Amino acid sequence: MAKKDYYDVLGVERGADEKEIKRAYKKLAMKYHPDRTQGNKELEEKFKEIQEAYEVLSDKQKRANYDQYGHAAFEQGGFGGGGFSGADFGDIFGDMFGDIFGGGRARQRVVRGDDLRYDLEISLEEAVRGTTKDIQINTLAHCDSCDGSGAEKGSKVETCSTCHGAGRVRRQQGFFVTEQVCPSCHGSGKKIEKPCKSCHGDGRVHKKKNLSVKIPAGVDTGNQLRLSGEGAAGENGAPNGDLYVVIHVRDHHIFERDGSNLYCEVPISFTMAALGGEIEVPTLDGRVKLKIPAETQTGKLFRMRGKGVTSARSAYAGDLICKIIVETPVKLNEEQKALLRQLEESLEGSSNKPKSSSFFDGVKKFFDNLGK
Protein backbone atom coordinates (compact mmCIF):
# COMPACT_ATOMS: atom_id res chain seq x y z
CA MET A 1 0.00 0.00 0.00
CA ALA A 2 1.33 3.45 -0.96
CA LYS A 3 2.63 5.53 1.93
CA LYS A 4 1.06 8.87 2.71
CA ASP A 5 3.01 12.04 2.22
CA TYR A 6 4.88 12.80 5.48
CA TYR A 7 3.82 16.45 5.39
CA ASP A 8 0.18 15.37 5.10
CA VAL A 9 0.63 12.92 7.97
CA LEU A 10 1.71 15.76 10.29
CA GLY A 11 -0.69 18.24 8.72
CA VAL A 12 1.97 20.85 7.85
CA GLU A 13 2.97 22.72 4.71
CA ARG A 14 6.13 21.71 2.81
CA GLY A 15 7.75 24.97 3.82
CA ALA A 16 7.05 24.46 7.56
CA ASP A 17 9.96 25.27 9.86
CA GLU A 18 11.36 23.03 12.60
CA LYS A 19 9.15 24.55 15.33
CA GLU A 20 5.95 24.04 13.33
CA ILE A 21 6.86 20.41 12.64
CA LYS A 22 7.68 19.76 16.28
CA ARG A 23 4.46 21.44 17.45
CA ALA A 24 2.35 19.42 15.00
CA TYR A 25 4.04 16.19 16.06
CA LYS A 26 3.51 16.84 19.77
CA LYS A 27 -0.19 17.49 19.24
CA LEU A 28 -0.72 14.33 17.18
CA ALA A 29 1.50 12.14 19.36
CA MET A 30 -0.45 13.17 22.44
CA LYS A 31 -3.73 12.33 20.68
CA TYR A 32 -2.69 8.93 19.30
CA HIS A 33 -0.31 7.76 22.05
CA PRO A 34 -0.90 4.03 22.83
CA ASP A 35 -1.58 4.88 26.48
CA ARG A 36 -4.68 6.75 25.28
CA THR A 37 -5.86 4.50 22.45
CA GLN A 38 -6.07 1.38 24.67
CA GLY A 39 -5.08 -1.35 22.26
CA ASN A 40 -6.79 0.02 19.14
CA LYS A 41 -4.59 -1.51 16.38
CA GLU A 42 -5.66 0.98 13.74
CA LEU A 43 -4.72 3.94 15.95
CA GLU A 44 -1.43 2.26 16.94
CA GLU A 45 -0.53 2.09 13.24
CA LYS A 46 -1.49 5.75 12.92
CA PHE A 47 0.87 6.56 15.81
CA LYS A 48 3.74 4.68 14.12
CA GLU A 49 3.04 6.59 10.90
CA ILE A 50 3.24 9.89 12.82
CA GLN A 51 6.56 8.85 14.42
CA GLU A 52 8.01 7.84 11.08
CA ALA A 53 7.01 11.14 9.51
CA TYR A 54 8.50 13.13 12.38
CA GLU A 55 11.77 11.20 12.34
CA VAL A 56 12.29 12.14 8.70
CA LEU A 57 11.06 15.74 8.76
CA SER A 58 12.85 16.65 12.01
CA ASP A 59 16.24 15.58 10.56
CA LYS A 60 17.67 18.10 8.08
CA GLN A 61 19.50 15.54 5.95
CA LYS A 62 16.62 13.05 5.86
CA ARG A 63 14.16 15.82 5.08
CA ALA A 64 16.33 17.03 2.19
CA ASN A 65 16.51 13.48 0.80
CA TYR A 66 12.75 13.06 1.19
CA ASP A 67 12.02 16.38 -0.49
CA GLN A 68 14.18 15.30 -3.46
CA TYR A 69 13.38 11.58 -3.79
CA GLY A 70 10.23 10.96 -1.73
CA HIS A 71 9.75 7.62 0.03
CA ALA A 72 12.24 5.99 -2.34
CA ALA A 73 15.04 7.71 -0.41
CA PHE A 74 14.51 5.28 2.50
CA GLU A 75 13.74 2.04 0.74
CA GLN A 76 16.30 -0.78 0.91
CA GLY A 77 19.16 0.20 -1.41
CA GLY A 78 17.50 3.53 -2.14
CA PHE A 79 19.16 6.87 -2.62
CA GLY A 80 19.31 7.92 1.01
CA GLY A 81 20.00 4.47 2.46
CA GLY A 82 20.14 3.67 6.10
CA GLY A 83 16.40 3.27 6.92
CA PHE A 84 15.19 4.67 10.28
CA SER A 85 17.69 4.99 13.08
CA GLY A 86 15.30 6.15 15.81
CA ALA A 87 15.06 9.88 16.36
CA ASP A 88 15.60 11.46 19.76
CA PHE A 89 12.01 11.50 20.99
CA GLY A 90 13.05 11.87 24.65
CA ASP A 91 12.82 15.64 24.71
CA ILE A 92 9.49 15.55 22.89
CA PHE A 93 7.87 13.20 25.39
CA GLY A 94 9.62 14.95 28.26
CA ASP A 95 7.87 18.14 27.19
CA MET A 96 4.57 16.37 26.62
CA PHE A 97 4.42 14.63 29.96
CA GLY A 98 6.20 17.32 31.96
CA ASP A 99 2.99 18.96 33.08
CA ILE A 100 1.42 15.62 33.94
CA PHE A 101 4.38 14.21 35.85
CA GLY A 102 5.69 17.36 37.46
CA GLY A 103 8.27 18.50 34.91
CA GLY A 104 11.67 17.09 34.16
CA ARG A 105 12.93 16.81 37.73
CA ALA A 106 11.88 14.45 40.46
CA ARG A 107 10.00 16.15 43.24
CA GLN A 108 8.58 14.67 46.40
CA ARG A 109 4.95 13.79 45.96
CA VAL A 110 2.73 16.22 47.83
CA VAL A 111 -0.87 15.04 47.96
CA ARG A 112 -3.46 17.39 49.42
CA GLY A 113 -5.99 15.78 51.74
CA ASP A 114 -9.35 14.62 50.44
CA ASP A 115 -12.35 16.93 50.51
CA LEU A 116 -15.18 15.59 52.67
CA ARG A 117 -18.97 15.97 52.48
CA TYR A 118 -21.44 16.17 55.34
CA ASP A 119 -25.21 16.26 54.76
CA LEU A 120 -26.93 18.42 57.37
CA GLU A 121 -30.71 18.51 57.89
CA ILE A 122 -32.22 21.65 59.44
CA SER A 123 -35.72 23.04 59.99
CA LEU A 124 -37.28 25.77 57.85
CA GLU A 125 -37.13 28.16 60.81
CA GLU A 126 -33.38 27.49 61.22
CA ALA A 127 -32.83 27.98 57.49
CA VAL A 128 -34.66 31.31 57.51
CA ARG A 129 -33.13 32.77 60.67
CA GLY A 130 -29.70 31.11 60.67
CA THR A 131 -28.31 28.91 63.41
CA THR A 132 -25.23 27.09 64.69
CA LYS A 133 -25.14 23.28 64.56
CA ASP A 134 -22.69 20.88 66.20
CA ILE A 135 -21.64 18.00 63.95
CA GLN A 136 -19.28 15.04 64.15
CA ILE A 137 -17.33 13.77 61.14
CA ASN A 138 -15.10 10.77 60.45
CA THR A 139 -11.82 11.91 58.96
CA LEU A 140 -8.11 11.23 58.49
CA ALA A 141 -6.22 13.42 60.94
CA HIS A 142 -2.58 14.25 61.65
CA CYS A 143 -1.06 11.50 63.84
CA ASP A 144 -0.14 12.99 67.22
CA SER A 145 1.99 10.00 68.26
CA CYS A 146 4.62 10.59 65.55
CA ASP A 147 3.77 14.23 64.78
CA GLY A 148 2.84 13.17 61.25
CA SER A 149 6.26 11.72 60.36
CA GLY A 150 5.06 8.11 60.25
CA ALA A 151 8.05 6.99 62.33
CA GLU A 152 8.39 5.93 65.95
CA LYS A 153 10.10 8.58 68.07
CA GLY A 154 13.87 8.20 67.77
CA SER A 155 13.58 6.08 64.63
CA LYS A 156 15.48 7.04 61.47
CA VAL A 157 13.67 8.46 58.46
CA GLU A 158 15.77 8.36 55.29
CA THR A 159 15.15 9.47 51.73
CA CYS A 160 14.14 6.55 49.51
CA SER A 161 17.16 5.51 47.45
CA THR A 162 15.02 4.27 44.56
CA CYS A 163 13.06 7.45 43.79
CA HIS A 164 15.34 9.91 45.67
CA GLY A 165 12.39 11.29 47.59
CA ALA A 166 10.10 11.87 44.61
CA GLY A 167 7.67 9.06 45.45
CA ARG A 168 7.48 8.16 41.76
CA VAL A 169 9.87 6.59 39.29
CA ARG A 170 10.19 6.89 35.53
CA ARG A 171 10.68 4.01 33.16
CA GLN A 172 11.95 4.48 29.61
CA GLN A 173 11.19 1.88 26.97
CA GLY A 174 12.71 3.03 23.72
CA PHE A 175 11.43 6.56 23.33
CA PHE A 176 8.39 5.97 25.57
CA VAL A 177 8.57 7.39 29.08
CA THR A 178 6.14 6.21 31.76
CA GLU A 179 5.85 7.15 35.42
CA GLN A 180 4.56 5.07 38.31
CA VAL A 181 4.44 4.98 42.10
CA CYS A 182 7.79 4.00 43.56
CA PRO A 183 7.65 0.27 44.45
CA SER A 184 10.15 0.70 47.31
CA CYS A 185 8.47 3.45 49.35
CA HIS A 186 4.93 3.17 47.90
CA GLY A 187 4.92 6.85 47.04
CA SER A 188 6.00 8.32 50.38
CA GLY A 189 9.50 9.26 49.16
CA LYS A 190 11.06 8.00 52.39
CA LYS A 191 12.22 4.87 54.16
CA ILE A 192 11.23 4.50 57.81
CA GLU A 193 13.30 2.30 60.12
CA LYS A 194 10.47 1.76 62.63
CA PRO A 195 6.97 2.78 61.51
CA CYS A 196 4.72 4.46 64.06
CA LYS A 197 2.46 1.92 65.77
CA SER A 198 -0.50 4.30 65.82
CA CYS A 199 -0.60 5.19 62.12
CA HIS A 200 1.49 2.30 60.71
CA GLY A 201 3.82 4.72 58.95
CA ASP A 202 1.17 6.79 57.16
CA GLY A 203 1.44 9.87 59.39
CA ARG A 204 -2.36 10.03 59.58
CA VAL A 205 -4.99 8.25 61.67
CA HIS A 206 -8.75 7.76 61.42
CA LYS A 207 -10.63 9.70 64.07
CA LYS A 208 -13.91 11.42 64.89
CA LYS A 209 -13.86 15.20 64.88
CA ASN A 210 -16.41 17.57 66.43
CA LEU A 211 -17.14 20.88 64.72
CA SER A 212 -19.52 23.81 65.15
CA VAL A 213 -20.99 24.98 61.86
CA LYS A 214 -22.48 28.45 61.57
CA ILE A 215 -25.46 28.38 59.19
CA PRO A 216 -26.18 31.81 57.68
CA ALA A 217 -29.76 33.07 57.44
CA GLY A 218 -31.55 32.38 54.16
CA VAL A 219 -29.92 29.09 53.13
CA ASP A 220 -31.93 26.55 51.17
CA THR A 221 -31.76 22.88 50.24
CA GLY A 222 -28.71 22.18 48.08
CA ASN A 223 -26.65 25.11 49.38
CA GLN A 224 -23.10 24.15 50.34
CA LEU A 225 -20.93 25.64 53.07
CA ARG A 226 -17.18 25.18 52.64
CA LEU A 227 -15.10 24.82 55.79
CA SER A 228 -11.56 25.39 54.57
CA GLY A 229 -8.95 22.95 55.92
CA GLU A 230 -11.49 20.82 57.81
CA GLY A 231 -11.24 17.89 55.39
CA ALA A 232 -8.82 14.96 55.58
CA ALA A 233 -5.16 15.57 56.42
CA GLY A 234 -2.75 15.63 53.47
CA GLU A 235 0.12 13.22 52.88
CA ASN A 236 3.70 14.12 53.78
CA GLY A 237 2.69 17.40 55.40
CA ALA A 238 0.54 18.53 52.46
CA PRO A 239 -2.45 20.81 53.19
CA ASN A 240 -5.73 19.41 54.49
CA GLY A 241 -8.71 19.10 52.21
CA ASP A 242 -11.93 21.04 52.79
CA LEU A 243 -15.24 20.01 54.34
CA TYR A 244 -18.40 20.72 52.37
CA VAL A 245 -21.59 20.88 54.44
CA VAL A 246 -24.62 20.30 52.19
CA ILE A 247 -27.87 21.79 53.51
CA HIS A 248 -31.19 19.89 53.47
CA VAL A 249 -34.26 21.78 54.75
CA ARG A 250 -36.97 19.55 56.22
CA ASP A 251 -40.54 19.78 54.90
CA HIS A 252 -42.71 22.11 56.98
CA HIS A 253 -46.24 21.21 58.13
CA ILE A 254 -47.62 24.64 57.13
CA PHE A 255 -45.33 26.35 54.65
CA GLU A 256 -43.79 25.41 51.33
CA ARG A 257 -40.79 27.37 50.14
CA ASP A 258 -39.93 28.41 46.59
CA GLY A 259 -36.84 30.60 46.56
CA SER A 260 -37.59 33.65 48.69
CA ASN A 261 -41.36 33.12 48.75
CA LEU A 262 -43.40 31.05 51.18
CA TYR A 263 -46.73 29.42 50.31
CA CYS A 264 -49.51 28.15 52.53
CA GLU A 265 -53.11 27.00 52.15
CA VAL A 266 -55.69 28.80 54.29
CA PRO A 267 -59.09 27.07 54.79
CA ILE A 268 -62.15 29.28 55.34
CA SER A 269 -65.84 28.48 55.82
CA PHE A 270 -68.19 28.86 52.88
CA THR A 271 -70.13 31.51 54.82
CA MET A 272 -66.98 33.60 55.28
CA ALA A 273 -66.17 33.09 51.61
CA ALA A 274 -69.62 34.41 50.71
CA LEU A 275 -69.93 37.21 53.26
CA GLY A 276 -66.29 38.16 53.84
CA GLY A 277 -64.52 38.64 57.15
CA GLU A 278 -61.14 38.66 58.83
CA ILE A 279 -58.91 35.75 59.84
CA GLU A 280 -55.48 35.23 61.38
CA VAL A 281 -52.81 33.55 59.26
CA PRO A 282 -49.42 32.27 60.43
CA THR A 283 -46.11 33.80 59.37
CA LEU A 284 -42.58 33.01 60.51
CA ASP A 285 -42.72 36.22 62.57
CA GLY A 286 -46.05 35.44 64.25
CA ARG A 287 -49.76 35.82 63.48
CA VAL A 288 -51.02 38.40 61.00
CA LYS A 289 -54.62 39.40 60.19
CA LEU A 290 -55.87 38.85 56.65
CA LYS A 291 -59.05 40.49 55.36
CA ILE A 292 -61.20 38.18 53.23
CA PRO A 293 -63.49 40.10 50.85
CA ALA A 294 -67.03 38.89 50.19
CA GLU A 295 -67.57 36.41 47.35
CA THR A 296 -64.03 34.95 47.63
CA GLN A 297 -63.61 31.74 45.63
CA THR A 298 -61.42 28.67 46.27
CA GLY A 299 -57.94 29.12 44.82
CA LYS A 300 -57.79 32.90 45.25
CA LEU A 301 -54.27 34.04 46.20
CA PHE A 302 -53.43 36.74 48.72
CA ARG A 303 -49.90 38.11 48.77
CA MET A 304 -48.41 39.37 52.03
CA ARG A 305 -45.36 41.35 51.01
CA GLY A 306 -42.12 40.96 52.95
CA LYS A 307 -43.41 38.00 54.97
CA GLY A 308 -41.32 35.44 53.09
CA VAL A 309 -37.59 34.65 53.33
CA THR A 310 -34.58 36.92 53.07
CA SER A 311 -32.24 34.71 51.03
CA ALA A 312 -28.52 34.45 51.74
CA ARG A 313 -27.79 36.37 48.51
CA SER A 314 -30.31 39.20 48.85
CA ALA A 315 -31.14 41.98 51.28
CA TYR A 316 -34.85 41.81 50.44
CA ALA A 317 -37.44 39.44 51.86
CA GLY A 318 -39.78 37.49 49.64
CA ASP A 319 -43.54 37.25 50.11
CA LEU A 320 -46.00 34.95 51.85
CA ILE A 321 -48.64 33.78 49.39
CA CYS A 322 -51.84 32.44 50.93
CA LYS A 323 -54.10 30.22 48.83
CA ILE A 324 -57.73 30.19 49.94
CA ILE A 325 -59.50 26.84 50.26
CA VAL A 326 -63.27 27.16 50.76
CA GLU A 327 -64.24 24.29 53.02
CA THR A 328 -67.48 22.40 52.41
CA PRO A 329 -69.23 21.63 55.71
CA VAL A 330 -69.45 17.94 56.65
CA LYS A 331 -71.50 15.81 59.10
CA LEU A 332 -74.57 18.05 58.85
CA ASN A 333 -77.68 17.34 60.94
CA GLU A 334 -81.18 17.42 59.47
CA GLU A 335 -81.88 20.98 60.55
CA GLN A 336 -78.66 22.22 58.91
CA LYS A 337 -79.44 20.33 55.71
CA ALA A 338 -82.90 21.89 55.60
CA LEU A 339 -81.42 25.37 56.00
CA LEU A 340 -79.01 24.71 53.13
CA ARG A 341 -81.82 23.48 50.88
CA GLN A 342 -83.78 26.58 51.73
CA LEU A 343 -80.75 28.71 50.86
CA GLU A 344 -80.25 26.83 47.58
CA GLU A 345 -83.86 27.47 46.56
CA SER A 346 -83.46 31.16 47.27
CA LEU A 347 -80.41 31.52 45.04
CA GLU A 348 -81.08 32.76 41.52
CA GLY A 349 -79.12 31.32 38.60
CA SER A 350 -76.73 33.67 36.86
CA SER A 351 -76.82 36.44 39.44
CA ASN A 352 -75.91 34.30 42.48
CA LYS A 353 -73.96 31.51 40.74
CA PRO A 354 -72.35 33.03 37.63
CA LYS A 355 -69.69 30.36 37.14
CA SER A 356 -72.13 27.46 37.49
CA SER A 357 -74.60 29.11 35.12
CA SER A 358 -71.88 29.85 32.58
CA PHE A 359 -70.50 26.31 32.79
CA PHE A 360 -73.84 24.54 32.34
CA ASP A 361 -74.88 26.89 29.54
CA GLY A 362 -71.64 25.97 27.78
CA VAL A 363 -72.27 22.25 28.32
CA LYS A 364 -75.80 22.57 26.86
CA LYS A 365 -74.45 24.33 23.75
CA PHE A 366 -71.78 21.66 23.34
CA PHE A 367 -74.30 18.81 23.28
CA ASP A 368 -76.71 20.77 21.07
CA ASN A 369 -73.96 21.29 18.49
CA LEU A 370 -72.88 17.67 18.80
CA GLY A 371 -76.34 16.46 17.79
CA LYS A 372 -76.52 18.58 14.62
Swiss-Prot record:
Intracellular or extracellular location(s): Cytoplasm
CXXCXGXG motif repeats mapped onto the chain: 143-150, 160-167, 182-189, 196-203
GO BP of this protein: chaperone cofactor-dependent protein refolding; DNA replication; protein refolding; response to heat
Domain J: from-to ranges: 5-70
Comment on bound cofactor: Binds 2 Zn(2+) ions per monomer.
Alphabetically ordered keywords of this record: Chaperone, Cytoplasm, DNA replication, Metal-binding, Repeat, Stress response, Zinc, Zinc-finger
GO cellular component: cytoplasm
Cofactor: Zn(2+)
InterPro entries: DnaJ, DnaJ_C, DnaJ_domain, DnaJ_domain_CS, HSP40/DnaJ_pept-bd, HSP_DnaJ_Cys-rich_dom, HSP_DnaJ_Cys-rich_dom_sf, J_dom_sf
Residues that bind Zn(2+) 1: 143, 146, 196, 199
GO MF entry, a single one: zinc ion binding
Entries under SUPFAM superfamilies matching the protein: Chaperone J-domain, DnaJ/Hsp40 cysteine-rich domain, HSP40/DnaJ peptide-binding domain
Zinc finger (CR-type): 130-208
Record: residues binding Zn(2+) 2: 160, 163, 182, 185
Primary role: Participates actively in the response to hyperosmotic and heat shock by preventing the aggregation of stress-denatured proteins and by disaggregating proteins, also in an autonomous, DnaK-independent fashion. Unfolded proteins bind initially to DnaJ; upon interaction with the DnaJ-bound protein, DnaK hydrolyzes its bound ATP, resulting in the formation of a stable complex. GrpE releases ADP from DnaK; ATP binding to DnaK triggers the release of the substrate protein, thus completing the reaction cycle.
Family to which the UniProt record says this protein belongs: Belongs to the DnaJ family.
Subunit and interaction comment: Homodimer.
Domain notes: The J domain is necessary and sufficient to stimulate DnaK ATPase activity. Zinc center 1 plays an important role in the autonomous, DnaK-independent chaperone activity of DnaJ. Zinc center 2 is essential for interaction with DnaK and for DnaJ activity.
Protein name as catalogued: Chaperone protein DnaJ
Species this chain originates from: Pasteurella multocida (strain Pm70)
